[in-house]
């Protein structure tokens, strides 16, 4: 179904089963496949390929030569029915690639809202990405990666499959992540190491000076006390009773399986 207000170039190919919302624009030579749903006021440039099953929300911008919803690159994939979901108001610049999930996980790749994917960013199968993140040019996410909210990835950075990055973390350019990065942490290097708290990012997002100070104290407990994760969790849990921002650390570390980056 194509809404009558949608603007579709004569050279674009749209499958009869696709659902195209109000005010959608689809540029020349783009291909919209079967079982694709594009939300209202989304703009699709020229030479874009979107395959289903894929659901895209409202107000997204998808630039030329981007591939959305393609089969994954996992060698175990054998044509199973898997999915991709994208929220609202995301920007995918030129040459981005986003793959659907696999049955070995939840059969789903999911991207939240308000994210910016710069040129050549790759999001592999089964990735889960939160809201308001920025991925600079050539950032690469392997399969099954989980990214929180307000995370920034520098250009040419990469993360190992099944890796996790907590909310408000900052990953420097050319970083290679082979372990998890807890919330609020700045990570850089190959392999990446922690370099303090993303204080500037927290200030921009309205964190109080008191909250930022508490986050820094928690950071020292995690990375400078010499304690294991099991030993530091009770300390952080107690700190979180006085400062709710610390709860992000607690929740993240409780779910840790791969280990976290270390100095």
From Swiss-Prot:
Localization of this protein: Cytoplasm
Record has Acyltransferase as a keyword: yes
SUPFAM superfamilies tied to this protein: Trimeric LpxA-like enzymes (SSF51161)
Extent of the signal sequence: none
Keyword Thylakoid: no
Catalysed reactions, semicolon-separated: a (3R)-hydroxyacyl-[ACP] + UDP-N-acetyl-alpha-D-glucosamine = a UDP-3-O-[(3R)-3-hydroxyacyl]-N-acetyl-alpha-D-glucosamine + holo-[ACP]
A GO biological-process term: lipid A biosynthetic process
Entry's EC annotation: 2.3.1.129
Molecular function, one GO term: acyl-[acyl-carrier-protein]-UDP-N-acetylglucosamine O-acyltransferase activity
Keywords: Acyltransferase, Cytoplasm, Lipid A biosynthesis, Lipid biosynthesis, Lipid metabolism, Repeat, Transferase
Family membership noted in the UniProt record: Belongs to the transferase hexapeptide repeat family. LpxA subfamily.
Subunit structure: Homotrimer.
PANTHER family linked: ACYL-[ACYL-CARRIER-PROTEIN]--UDP-N-ACETYLGLUCOSAMINE O-ACYLTRANSFERASE (PTHR43480), ACYL-[ACYL-CARRIER-PROTEIN]--UDP-N-ACETYLGLUCOSAMINE O-ACYLTRANSFERASE, MITOCHONDRIAL-RELATED (PTHR43480:SF1)
The protein's role, per its UniProt record: Involved in the biosynthesis of lipid A, a phosphorylated glycolipid that anchors the lipopolysaccharide to the outer membrane of the cell.
Protein name from the UniProt record: Acyl-[acyl-carrier-protein]--UDP-N-acetylglucosamine O-acyltransferase
Organism: Aeromonas hydrophila subsp. hydrophila (strain ATCC 7966 / DSM 30187 / BCRC 13018 / CCUG 14551 / JCM 1027 / KCTC 2358 / NCIMB 9240 / NCTC 8049)
């Amino acid at each position: 179904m194509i809404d009558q207000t949608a603007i579709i170039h004569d050279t674009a190919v749209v499958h009869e089963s696709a659902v195209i919302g109000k005010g959608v624009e689809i540029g020349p030579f783009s291909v919209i496949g079967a079982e694709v749903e594009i939300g209202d006021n989304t703009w699709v440039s020229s030479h874009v390929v979107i395959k289903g099953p894929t659901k895209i929300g409202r107000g997204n911008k998808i630039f030329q030569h981007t591939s959305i919803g393609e089969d994954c690159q996992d060698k175990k994939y054998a044509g199973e029915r898997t999915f991709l979901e994208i929220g609202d108001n995301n920007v995918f610049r030129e040459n981005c690639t986003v793959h659907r999930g696999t049955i070995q996980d939840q059969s789903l790749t999911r991207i939240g809202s308000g994210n910016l994917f710069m040129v050549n960013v790759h999001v592999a199968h089964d990735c889960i990405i939160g809201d308001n993140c920025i991925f600079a040019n050539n950032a690469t996410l392997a399969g099954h990666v989980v990214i929180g909210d307000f995370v920034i990835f520098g250009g040419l950075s990469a993360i190992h499959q099944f890796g996790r990055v907590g909310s408000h973390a900052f990953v420097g350019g050319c970083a290679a992540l082979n372990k998890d990065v807890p919330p609020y942490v700045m990570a850089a290097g190959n392999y990446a190491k922690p370099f303090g708290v993303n204080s500037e990012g927290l200030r921009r997002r309205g964190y109080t000076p008191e909250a930022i100070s508490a986050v820094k104290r928690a950071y020292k407990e995690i990375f400078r006390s010499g304690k294991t994760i099991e030993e530091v969790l009770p300390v952080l849990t107690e700190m979180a009773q006085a400062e709710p921002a610390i709860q992000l650390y607690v929740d993240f570390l409780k779910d840790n399986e791969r280990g976290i980056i270390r100095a």
